[in-house]
């Protein structure tokens, strides 16, 4: 240990000053210190304060008056300061009052200091020699707690990550998760409060994030080759990197390892240091007490324990004699109490007896075996306890080291010499050989023997040079009789020389070291005489042998003997110093061992040896009387004063210096005090409270759990000093309750352990084998039970703040379990579930009010912060609605957190808390009902026919409908009742609005396609089409009938309907119907019947609106066709194609807007489809009729060339005459070309502009067939006439081009090569042959025969 001499001067001065203040004196052995809570409170230890209820409970008993009277006897005297030539004070009474207060303060501080020093002595002894407890290795490891500064650092690191200031690469999903974690968890005031309470660790932060992301990751779509677990582990690794920041992970790991080690096993030095801090002991005070108490001497500590246990047995007998019992709940417990006291001491004796005798100074925390061997403990029957000589056999180890020899003069320098060594009865060893000129070795021989006085022989030999010599020549020898007390260093010994050796002055330098076995406590030569043993006054060699922790014997030995000659078992003897006995010569310093009927007198040769013997025997006898050397008594008497005797054994050479130092510094009273005279219940209460303060202020998130080292010391203290288990746990519970009530986070499981122990004890279940119950224990238990119930109910009421984000893990469940236990009337009868539910229901009802009040306050703070930016903004209905929506978001967030973090008992498959889910649902409904009041108030002030409140419904409904417990609950139904009329009104107005827009739109419809309209609009960024969930239609007209503005194509329409070329009115109609249905669908109306009604109504509305659109388009189509040209100049207008496209869109939209899943509702869709099909057929028929009319016009022109008409003859004559002089153009080709151009253009326009291929095919098929039928009919009418050459050329060109054009447009061959076409082809072929014969010039290359050249020429 450290030498305290360095601090001695300074400490001496300090304590000399303090001694002038008159130290509280105490009686030599009797003053019982009774700690007072007032003095403890003035000690200034962190977090102590006043204890409130229960203050001073432990200060009862009879000790309080003793301490106070002792203090009052010699306190600071005000007169000593007021005397002398001091100027007169204007107000002596005031000054004296101040002095009195100062005196009382100093007196309390001194009393507190002395109490702590005394307590530290008891704690030191527990640490130095534990024999009951060990440091537990199975305790849950506590995490390092987060401080406010660390929390801020973590916030900054996450903010830096979100700002992109770190090197950590992350995708958007992870960024969103971190953003949410940062906003919801790290910035939460509940987390700040948890940090302040000391219950937040880095592991808590990590677990909350892990739980936070698990749902997010599970909801992500599957990615091939990447499992969800891989994503989770990757995200957690990134989280750790953010949390750690730039810190070197190796340093963090090293720090964590070190902290983990300190949480497991502490060395003695670490424990001393810890309790110095806990009790406020200075280093030099520790050093003085350590040395004076001989804490490094296990024999002294074991002896101290034996004395303490003997004192406790005597105290039990005294209590029984004087009938000074504590007040028990039953009179019959008094006798039981004595039995328990004795039984507990016997158990401690058994524990001590089971300790190995060879226990050294090292600190072994092995599991101690409980011995049930009562024969050694029972001191009544000596016959059972007698030792035989074989019981005290000792085993010694000897080391013999031969250094060198001197005096070899007669031998030649080169002669070989060597030595042998042996312990009598053992083997013989030999050194190496050396020359006579330099006989040095340094050789060690190791021996073992059972002789207490062994004979060690060392012989010196030289090698014989004679031829016939059989053995070497012995030159000399030495025989030594070492003892464990012999000098250990090498010494010169004169050798006994052999007869024929000329060198007579041989000396040998050697060392003999004989160890001291652990069970040999002292040895040496003493003069002795006794009645039963050692009956002659004679000097003998004695060994004090420890056979077991409670059995010692004084044994006398003779040389070369393993067993003692005689022995005296020291049980029941008392050793003390005596004066020299007359008539006994041979010893100088006398002492004796006395027992009823026997006295043994011992004498040593000097005073020092006597002190050592008395000290060793004092430890062995276990006597209460402390022998004081006559020299020490003289010293004490010379100093004067009534100083208590020293408990620490004092020697003239080592112990005396420590004792003098301790006495000089006023420590002797703490060392010599008898532990049995103290109220250990109140002392333990104090040390446990101070230890808890220290624990809660260290760097661990302990939640009230002591560290293993602290548990070990407190366990040992309780066992060694007889602190009742119930008292210990009651004090612990009270201290924990005080901390919990002041905001510290305490583990409910820890409270449960102590409460269950106390409840079991108070109800007579003997959890620690103690059956007696005091009235004080019962009363304190009932008081603490009530305090605990109030605390637990308060914690459940404030569960969001006492267990934020479900931390500490399992704490809420443990709190419910503990409350259920607290509500039990006894430990056997379980409390009815309904009673527990009633209590918790009441708590959760209050919790709803607390949570909503705090949420409203938070929302108002947010609102005020925003209003600060918008100063002067009035609280309009819109503002109220905006605030309500924000409040709804917070309400949902709270309910989601409750479900995620506070529904743990419901997760359990067991039925212990199966009802918790129901109560949490009730809590949620109560919470929502409070919100409903504010929501209703905000909705009431909204103007009529406004739809801004629908997002509020969507927000709440989307949350409620997915919650199994809240869906269609009380609040959910209230929400539906509130919004159902609004939805109906909205649909009514939308229906009127859309109907009106159809009516007006078609009146003004230009039938230009939307593409053409939007291509002329300015290029703008297209918004997200999913955003406008509620169509922004001006339906809030006071008259109620919505007035639709003139349609102008919005910028988004091209993006949505990029493939369509419908009209503006139709596209607007379809979008509005779709938006309305999407909006209603997105409402996800929870009530099935009303939802179906809404859907059915919207489908019917869509059906009616589309039907109206189709009919209006059909009418417009017919009107448009009637206004167009009937000649080959006709070109299919864009509007005609747009109308076809409206039909296409109508059919596509009807599938989506009019169809329902089940039964009769399909009729809407099928009716509209039939209408569209019929209308399209009619439109195709009308258009084909238009084409046929144009063809008939062409054929009418050709009819003028019929054979026999005036025009035909005139034309023929004119052409023939003119052709002689000029090149006349081919007659009829202009008509044919005009028709072919009309057909091709019409085909191209229709193919390009109409979006439905099926309609085009049907149109072309019908058009081709109708055309061929008209031509065939025209030719049939002229069956008897030969076609004019011009008619023939025109028809051939028209028929061939029509056939090829329709084939290119995809008309099937089966349609093209119809019988009608074949009839036409055959007729024209015949006519062509006839013409080629009758006309000399022929047809000028025009023929019905297929020819590529002709095609090229014609094209």
UniProtKB/Swiss-Prot annotation:
<dbReference type="GO" id="GO:0046872">
    <property type="term" value="F:metal ion binding"/>
</dbReference>
<feature type="region of interest" description="Mediates targeting and association with DCVs">
    <location>
        <begin position="1179"/>
        <end position="1355"/>
    </location>
</feature>
<dbReference type="GO" id="GO:0098978">
    <property type="term" value="C:glutamatergic synapse"/>
</dbReference>
<keyword id="KW-0653">Protein transport</keyword>
<feature type="modified residue" description="Phosphoserine">
    <location>
        <position position="259"/>
    </location>
</feature>
<feature type="region of interest" description="Interaction with DRD2">
    <location>
        <begin position="792"/>
        <end position="1131"/>
    </location>
</feature>
<dbReference type="GO" id="GO:0015031">
    <property type="term" value="P:protein transport"/>
</dbReference>
<keyword id="KW-0472">Membrane</keyword>
<dbReference type="GO" id="GO:0051649">
    <property type="term" value="P:establishment of localization in cell"/>
</dbReference>
<feature type="domain" description="PH">
    <location>
        <begin position="519"/>
        <end position="622"/>
    </location>
</feature>
<feature type="compositionally biased region" description="Basic and acidic residues">
    <location>
        <begin position="96"/>
        <end position="107"/>
    </location>
</feature>
<dbReference type="Pfam" id="PF25341">
    <property type="entry name" value="C2_CAPS"/>
</dbReference>
<dbReference type="GO" id="GO:0008289">
    <property type="term" value="F:lipid binding"/>
</dbReference>
<keyword id="KW-0770">Synapse</keyword>
<feature type="domain" description="MHD1">
    <location>
        <begin position="933"/>
        <end position="1113"/>
    </location>
</feature>
<keyword id="KW-0813">Transport</keyword>
<protein>
    <recommendedName>
        <fullName>Calcium-dependent secretion activator 1</fullName>
    </recommendedName>
</protein>
<dbReference type="GO" id="GO:0019901">
    <property type="term" value="F:protein kinase binding"/>
</dbReference>
<feature type="region of interest" description="Disordered">
    <location>
        <begin position="1331"/>
        <end position="1355"/>
    </location>
</feature>
<keyword id="KW-0106">Calcium</keyword>
<dbReference type="GO" id="GO:0099012">
    <property type="term" value="C:neuronal dense core vesicle membrane"/>
</dbReference>
<feature type="domain" description="C2">
    <location>
        <begin position="378"/>
        <end position="493"/>
    </location>
</feature>
<dbReference type="GO" id="GO:0098793">
    <property type="term" value="C:presynapse"/>
</dbReference>
<dbReference type="GO" id="GO:0016050">
    <property type="term" value="P:vesicle organization"/>
</dbReference>
<dbReference type="InterPro" id="IPR000008">
    <property type="entry name" value="C2_dom"/>
</dbReference>
<keyword id="KW-0968">Cytoplasmic vesicle</keyword>
<dbReference type="InterPro" id="IPR033227">
    <property type="entry name" value="CAPS"/>
</dbReference>
<feature type="compositionally biased region" description="Acidic residues">
    <location>
        <begin position="1"/>
        <end position="16"/>
    </location>
</feature>
<feature type="modified residue" description="Phosphoserine">
    <location>
        <position position="34"/>
    </location>
</feature>
<dbReference type="GO" id="GO:0031410">
    <property type="term" value="C:cytoplasmic vesicle"/>
</dbReference>
<dbReference type="InterPro" id="IPR010439">
    <property type="entry name" value="MUN_dom"/>
</dbReference>
<keyword id="KW-0446">Lipid-binding</keyword>
<feature type="modified residue" description="Phosphoserine">
    <location>
        <position position="89"/>
    </location>
</feature>
<feature type="modified residue" description="Phosphoserine">
    <location>
        <position position="96"/>
    </location>
</feature>
<comment type="function">
    <text>Calcium-binding protein involved in exocytosis of vesicles filled with neurotransmitters and neuropeptides. Probably acts upstream of fusion in the biogenesis or maintenance of mature secretory vesicles. Regulates catecholamine loading of DCVs. May specifically mediate the Ca(2+)-dependent exocytosis of large dense-core vesicles (DCVs) and other dense-core vesicles by acting as a PtdIns(4,5)P2-binding protein that acts at prefusion step following ATP-dependent priming and participates in DCVs-membrane fusion.</text>
</comment>
<dbReference type="GO" id="GO:0099525">
    <property type="term" value="P:presynaptic dense core vesicle exocytosis"/>
</dbReference>
<dbReference type="InterPro" id="IPR011993">
    <property type="entry name" value="PH-like_dom_sf"/>
</dbReference>
<dbReference type="GO" id="GO:0016082">
    <property type="term" value="P:synaptic vesicle priming"/>
</dbReference>
<dbReference type="Pfam" id="PF06292">
    <property type="entry name" value="MUN"/>
</dbReference>
<keyword id="KW-0268">Exocytosis</keyword>
<feature type="region of interest" description="Disordered">
    <location>
        <begin position="1"/>
        <end position="107"/>
    </location>
</feature>
<comment type="subunit">
    <text>Homodimer. Interacts with the dopamine receptor DRD2. Interacts with RASL10B.</text>
</comment>
